Amino acid sequence: MSAQRIRIKLRSYDHRLLDQSAKRIVEVAKRTGAKVAGPIPLPTDRRVYCVTRSPHIDKDSREHFEIKMHKRLIDIIDPTQETVSNLMSLELPAGVDIHLKL
């Protein structure tokens, strides 16, 4: 019989905020007696936008902007009911996107 597991994927533009949130989730899970694998850093998505500097002429003059999406993965193995309720009541910053998979 396979063990029950909760997979949490965190995404954010700010890596410091992301690491703090991952640390809080791991602390809550360990405090309630569940086994934790992670946080595992996933590849960073990098999006580059190319914009012309002038609105009229000179197409050769362009500017590049980039935005990076940092990601982490946390697996909680054999979670108890207390673990699930504590994770649901956990307050995390607004800049962190969370996806849960049971």
Swiss-Prot record:
BP GO terms, sorted: translation
Family in the record: Belongs to the universal ribosomal protein uS10 family.
Gene Ontology CC entries for this record: ribonucleoprotein complex; ribosome
Subunit structure: Part of the 30S ribosomal subunit.
HAMAP family reported for this sequence: Ribosomal_uS10
Single Gene Ontology MF annotation: structural constituent of ribosome
Name of protein: Small ribosomal subunit protein uS10
A Pfam family hit: Ribosomal_S10
Key words, A-Z: Ribonucleoprotein, Ribosomal protein
SUPFAM superfamilies xrefs: Ribosomal protein S10 (SSF54999)
Record's keyword annotation contains Ribonucleoprotein: yes
Gene3D superfamilies per UniProt: Ribosomal protein S10 domain (3.30.70.600)
The keyword Ribonucleoprotein appears for this protein: yes
InterPro entries: Ribosomal_uS10, Ribosomal_uS10_CS, Ribosomal_uS10_dom, Ribosomal_uS10_dom_sf
Protein function: Involved in the binding of tRNA to the ribosomes.
Coiled-coil residue windows: none
Primary gene name: rpsJ
Organism annotation: Coprothermobacter proteolyticus (strain ATCC 35245 / DSM 5265 / OCM 4 / BT)
Superkingdom of this protein's organism: Bacteria
